[in-house]
Amino acid sequence: MATIIGYFILLFVVSWLASRKSDANTALTGGREAPWYIVAIAMIGAPISGVTFVSVPGMVAAKSFSYMQMVLGFAVGYFVIAYVLVPLFFKRNLVSIYGYLEERFGGKTHKTGAWFFFISKILGAAVRFYVVCVTLQALMFEPLGIPFIVNVLVTIALIFLYTLQGGVKTVIWTDTLKSICLILSVVLCIFFVGQALNFDFTGLCSAVASSDTSRIFFFDNPSEGTYFWKQFLAGIFMVIAMTGLDQDLMQRTLASKNVKESKKGLIVSGITQVFVVGLFLVLGTILTLYMSKMGLNYDKSTDEIFGIVAFDSKMSVVVGILF
């Protein structure tokens, strides 16, 4: 509980610091003062959520490191966005990327694109928000006897307040905080699970490299979902569609000082995400090793492995807190 409260307090401190020089004119662009490296870090955490924290390690037992093929496609997709879409948006000095649709195709297309974005973000955010609220209910509100509906309303109010306070500038800095927390969490989880397996750094690397689950590339069967070209090409087009044409994510890059800074932030973010996802996959492998050593059973087709290990009685309580 103290961890959760402390995190929200830290969010509000970051929000207050970010919003000190904000006004109505800079709410959507952040005054175009965001440093490229802050945008890069923020872009790492923006598409990653608690669902990623559970599902990516969870898929390793069934699909090995095949997800990395798609992530490599993500990195290529970020280059396409940086060199094709970003110059287009900056050249027209757009606040909303859907403003280009109005210039090119007219008002109806603009409104249609904006509404599709709005509806898709509501649905996606609803799923992520539900996962967060379920976790908060189990860890914090349920022990206090507080109903789930109160949990939902309080969480919505907190998110609304820290976002409203500074606009996109606050969003960028809080996403940066989230990115750092996520990366630290996965690194610490790897450390503590590795410690439970009596691995030093060399032993950990050796165990992961020799594991059957650490295979990355799959070229042998084109009909399989793990086939390289399916994953790689899907990754490229997914990032172009879900990041390059997404106002929520591109608004962060449009807050950069200029097109050069925006490109730099996107490219660094795309490359860094390869390493971050690699950490999640490594965590997945050592979780399967821990399950095997402790004789714990789980369904390989589900994402339950991290939760089982995190709350195992023999595991460090820190892993449960980080989870």
List where the protein language model places each region.
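Helix-loop-helix module between adjacent transmembrane segments
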Residues: M68-L164, A234-V239
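Membrane-embedded alpha-helical core segments of multi-pass
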Residues: L10, T52, G77-V84, N93-L94, ...
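Loop-to-helix junctions at membrane interfaces in multi-pass transport proteins
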Residues: R32, I38, V54-Q69, E102, ...
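Residue-level recognition of pore/gate-forming positions within transmembrane alpha-helices
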Residues: F8-L11, A46-P47, F74-Y78, F118-K121, ...
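Extracellular loop-to-transmembrane helix junctions
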Residues: M1-A18, G30, A34, I38, ...
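Juxtamembrane interface elements at the cytosolic ends of transmembrane helices
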Residues: L10-A24, V84-Y98, L158-L161, Q165-G167, ...
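Membrane-interface "cap" regions at the ends of multi-pass membrane proteins
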Residues: M1-F53, T163-G166, S179, S185-L188
